[in-house]
Amino acid sequence: MKAIFNRRVVVDSSSRLTKLLANPTTHSHLNRQTFTSLYKPNQSRHFRTHYLPSSPSSPPVSRFDPSQLWRSEKIRGFFASALGNKAVKLGNLVESRVGFIGSQFPKKGFEFQRFSGFQRRGWKHWLQGLSDRDVVLGLVIANAGVFVMWRVFNQQFMMNNFMISLDNFKSGRLHTLITSAFSHIDIGHIVSNMIGLYFFGTSIARNFGPQFLLKLYLAGALGGSVFYLIHHAYMAATSPKGQGAFVRDPSRTPGLGASGAVNAIMLLDIFLHPRATLYLEFFIPVPAMLLGIFLIGKDILRITEGNSNISGSAHLGGAAVAAIAWARIRKGRFRF
């Protein structure tokens, strides 16, 4: 308010002096023309239009009277000082208004700082903010989402992007090494895998953190896919050719499911707690060590028989990842 009052005093005084000294019409226009030419043209017009009192315009003066030079210099100096004071006070007024508005409306920089901080720290910082159950439920929801996609999206699109096979791998669809571990078609398949993921995954996340669990899941998925491809490449190279239309080509046989990833999580928990009691088929109590031996032996048998719809090679890939993770933990390297 003080800045506004001062500006009004300066403007009123300058306007009154202009009227007193500008009785002759020629002098009034002469002074106004001299002031405009010596000060910056754009700024003088701007301030004069918005802050100086308006007066009727007259025809421009084309001649200069030398007798009014001294008087013009004094008036010009007065107006220049008045304009300078007014410009300073105008700046103070703008700053005070900006400060007032800023105090009434606080800065909304939290979201930007939060986003920039997320960019700087990346996924690692984001994962550290998640709880153990958050990661487990997130993996379950991701698997359930792909399960729904099988019933909504085009089947060929799903086979090309959510199933692992030698054809997909040779075609450059390397993302299927991971996406196939989130893919299920049969309801019984996804239910059994998600139950194992929930119970054993919660135990692993509680002991080593959610970031470790996510890395273990992805490593198990990758290990299961690699073992699956190696096994089917071997079968494609050794299988007889031209045995009829009903012989499956191993290079074109696709696979899917989270079994490799879940097997890595489950077997790591078994390796860490071999004397714990687990329940086979949900109601048969057996020592964890015996259950682990039984599961690995059954997968080896599936590979040797070669006619099972369950991929023993993918399960063994998960078991290999679990063994590597267990060895690193034994050496004190908790970061997988």
UniProtKB/Swiss-Prot annotation:
Keywords: Hydrolase, Membrane, Mitochondrion, Protease, Transit peptide, Transmembrane, Transmembrane helix. Residues 1-85 form a transit peptide. Belongs to the peptidase S54 family. The active site is at S259, H315. It is a multi-pass membrane protein. One of its GO terms (biological process) is proteolysis. InterPro entries: Peptidase_S54_rhomboid_dom, Rhomboid-like_sf, Rhomboid_protease_S54. It is found in: Mitochondrion membrane. The gene is RBL12. The functional differences between RBL12 and the yeast Pcp1 appear to be at least caused by differences in their transmembrane domains. This is RHOMBOID-like protein 12, mitochondrial. Its EC number is 3.4.21.-. Probable rhomboid-type serine protease that catalyzes intramembrane proteolysis. Unable to cleave either of the yeast Pcp1 substrates in yeast cells. It is an enzyme of class 3 (hydrolase). Pfam families: Rhomboid. It comes from the Eukaryota. The chain crosses the membrane at residues 135-155, 185-205, 216-236, 254-274, 276-296, 307-327. GO terms for molecular function: serine-type endopeptidase activity. Its main location: mitochondrion. One of its GO terms (cellular component) is mitochondrion. It comes from Arabidopsis thaliana (Mouse-ear cress).
